[in-house]
């Protein structure tokens, strides 16, 4: 099958949606399918995958408590049109087609076997509310809609009064399960955090507030932090006497991330909101590391209300400290969560998730139908393809 995938976000900026699309592409390539991915890119030379086509440089906009780098407008529409016209796709899979992006452009320009995946969880998305009347006739063109979680599904219902099939984000369970720990990182009583800690919603400040109390109860405890951001600035809130126990590793690749998860005693996800899934939690479970996470809806649902990890009261650093101390002291409890998490991680393996998505493709495609372009006479096509005539 010839499959076209569209990323709304810049390919050269790390993010959960981009990682999902990349891994899905590799999974289908391994199955013998032909894949092409269209994505914005700030630096085209940084793209290493030969199946990725750059649609141009994105612009940064505030979105869902973070900064999204997206591409939109008539020039971008022209590039989408050229890519679709030359792709001869059996199915076109659009990610986040409800925000101004390449995916929305493609949904307006193309017709046929179109599938949309909705990742975001934001009940008060101002942008989507503002353009909802224009979105509805476009989103209706999707033959199938996927939401990565019940939280994302509910967001779709609120904004666009439509429903979706829930298929979670995928991971390679074997990749994380078989990773080797890093001797420089592995030590008892080690807490790990991975994320863009420059974004307040990732909750690093909550973890750092909790760390002082944890250190009093467990003098040997230490904290490893990985991800983009300024470690010096983050450390300003930490007691100087404790700073030697905290190490900032900077941005790390997937191999180092898997090794880090194998090297720590507990993974903590103190995110305060804006999450629809929690891919890092599935990766941690696949690594066999017990989890302490905030009780935001996405994490509570993923961990089944504490069945697969300890939950603490969101933004409550005292409760976070109590839960981490409890898990670090109670080896039996930690082992229980390690085993149950490993079992639960199988639900998110690409061997299952990829096959579920393929079934959606087959249902959307019907009898050997192809993705085609709409006529220029259609209103949405005229709106988004004016750049071709300039």
What do the PLM-derived regions correspond to, one by one?
Residues 251-252, 259-264, 279:
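Short alpha-helical donor nucleotide-sugar binding micro-motif in glycosyltransferases
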Residues 7-12, 22, 26-74, 228-231:
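N-terminal strand-loop element at the rim of the active site
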Residues 183-202, 208-212, 224:
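Conserved donor-binding/catalytic core segment of Leloir-type glycosyltransferases
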Residues 305-306, 310-317, 326-332, 346:
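Conserved acidic donor-binding segment of nucleotide-sugar-dependent glycosyltransferases
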Residues 122, 127-145, 157-159:
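Membrane-proximal helix-turn-helix segments that form the acceptor-binding/catalytic region
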Residues 235-256:
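Nucleotide-activated donor-binding/catalytic signature segment of Leloir-type glycosyltransferases, i.e.
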Residues 151, 170:
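Carbohydrate-associated surface elements
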């Amino acid at each position: 099958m010839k499959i076209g995938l569209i990323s709304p976000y810049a390919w050269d900026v790390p993010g959960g949606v981009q990682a999902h699309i990349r891994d899905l592409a590799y999974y289908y390539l391994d199955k013998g399918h032909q894949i092409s991915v269209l994505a914005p890119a700030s630096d085209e030379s940084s793209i290493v995958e030969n199946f990725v086509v750059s649609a141009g440089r994105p612009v940064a906009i505030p979105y869902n408590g973070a900064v999204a780098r997206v591409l939109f407008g008539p020039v971008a529409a022209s590039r989408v049109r050229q890519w679709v016209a030359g792709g001869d796709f059996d199915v076109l899979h659009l990610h986040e087609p409800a925000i101004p992006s390449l995916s929305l452009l493609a949904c307006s320009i193309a017709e046929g076997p179109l599938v949309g995946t909705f990742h975001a969880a934001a009940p008060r998305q101002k942008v989507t509310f503002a353009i909802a009347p224009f979105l509805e006739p476009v989103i209706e063109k999707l033959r199938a809609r996927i939401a990565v979680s019940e939280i994302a599904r509910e967001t779709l219902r609120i904004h666009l009064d439509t429903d979706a099939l829930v298929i979670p984000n995928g991971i390679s369970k074997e990749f994380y399960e078989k990773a080797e720990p890093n001797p420089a990182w592995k030590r008892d009583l080690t807490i790990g955090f991975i994320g863009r800690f420059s974004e307040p919603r990732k909750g690093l400040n909550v973890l750092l507030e909790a760390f002082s109390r944890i250190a009093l109860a467990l003098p040997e405890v230490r904290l490893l932090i990985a991800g983009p951001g300024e470690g010096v600035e983050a450390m300003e809130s930490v007691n100087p006497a404790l700073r030697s126990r905290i190490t900032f590793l900077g941005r790390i690749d997937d191999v180092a991330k898997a090794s880090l998860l194998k090297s720590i005693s507990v993974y903590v996800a103190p995110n305060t909101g804006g999450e629809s899934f929690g891919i890092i939690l599935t990766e941690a479970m696949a690594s066999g590391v017990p989890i302490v996470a905030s009780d935001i809806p996405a994490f509570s649902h993923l961990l089944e209300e504490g069945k697969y990890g300890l939950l603490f009261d969101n933004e409550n650093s005292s409760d976070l400290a109590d839960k981490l101390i409890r898990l670090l002291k109670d080896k039996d409890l930690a082992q229980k969560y390690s085993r149950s998490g490993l079992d639960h991680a199988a639900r998110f393996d690409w061997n299952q998730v990829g096959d579920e998505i393929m079934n959606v493709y087959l249902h959307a495609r019907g009898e050997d139908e192809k993705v085609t372009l709409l006529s220029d006479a259609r209103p949405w096509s005229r709106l988004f393809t004016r750049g071709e005539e300039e």
